[in-house]
């Protein structure tokens, strides 16, 4: 696959200026870059707010290819994890050099953080391009292959043409979770979340491509040769 694509991204830095470390944040399936910076409850659940305001990191959130304000593509043959890995690599190269964007900053280190499918992309980036990152954080991530099937089944994915909130935003071929039960099953542990957050996740949910869902395992199945720092955060049952 080859082509020209546009990525929608948001850069944040402390009031005092750029942090020495840039965190590049990659969201999972069913979300966009706002996953990392929700304004609900006065930004109480915003990762970006904590990272920037309290710990003085710079952050870069982006809509993965095929999602939100980034370029769309063929949802089966084009928008797969392999293209997403390359997109994250190019975004990282741009961020490191500062060329091609209006940010006057240079960073001592770049750390990549992922959620769910975003963690699979982050893991694969570190394995494929180990020099592109100084450390990775994987949340909602597992190398147990059985969970891929559970995710696909629990997601209750239907064509976007059957979801009024998404049908006007995505071309035919994309899919989305049909109801709150699906999102609850895949992302919210019973009794451990604010119910209003589940409602927000449904209202602001985004679509996915079948190509992504079918290639999730490619980002997690093999051993990783990356020798830098790794933090893995995955909830139990």
Predicted regions and their residues:
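Alpha/beta-hydrolase
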Residues: 151-237
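Short, surface-exposed "cap/lid" segments of acyl-processing enzymes
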Residues: 16-56, 60
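Conserved hydrolase catalytic core segment
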Residues: 108-144
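Glycine-rich "HGGG/HGxG" loop immediately N-terminal to the catalytic nucleophile
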Residues: 34-35, 63-78
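Glycine-rich His-Gly loop
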Residues: 25-31, 115-116, 235-236
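Short beta-to-alpha linker loops that shape the active-site pocket of alpha/beta-hydrolase fold enzymes
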Residues: 29, 63-67, 142
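Alpha/beta-hydrolase active-site loop
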Residues: 77-104
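N-terminal cap/lid segment of alpha/beta-hydrolase-fold proteins
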Residues: 1-18
């Amino acid at each position: 696959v080859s082509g020209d694509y546009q990525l929608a991204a948001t850069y944040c830095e402390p009031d005092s200026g750029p942090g020495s470390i840039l965190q590049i944040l990659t969201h999972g399936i069913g979300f966009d870059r706002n996953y990392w910076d929700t304004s609900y409850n006065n930004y109480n659940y915003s990762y970006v707010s904590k990272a920037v305001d309290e710990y003085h990191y710079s952050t870069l959130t982006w809509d993965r290819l095929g999602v939100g304000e980034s370029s769309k593509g063929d949802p089966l043959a084009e928008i797969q994890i392999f293209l997403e890995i390359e997109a994250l690599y190019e975004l990282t190269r741009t961020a490191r050099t500062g060329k091609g964007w209006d940010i006057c900053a240079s960073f001592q280190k770049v750390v990549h953080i992922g959620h769910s499918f975003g963690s699979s992309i982050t893991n694969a980036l570190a394995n494929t391009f180990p020099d592109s990152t100084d450390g990775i954080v994987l949340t909602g991530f597992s190398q147990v292959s059985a969970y891929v099937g559970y995710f696909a089944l629990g997601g209750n994915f239907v064509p976007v043409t059957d979801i009024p909130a998404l049908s006007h935003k995505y071309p035919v071929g994309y899919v989305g979770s049909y109801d709150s039960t699906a999102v609850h099953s895949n992302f919210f542990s019973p009794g451990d979340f604010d119910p209003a957050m589940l409602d927000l996740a449904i209202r602001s949910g985004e679509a996915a491509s079948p190509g992504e869902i079918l290639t999730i395992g490619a980002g997690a199945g093999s051993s990783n040769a990356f020798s830098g720092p790794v933090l893995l955060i995955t909830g139990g049952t």
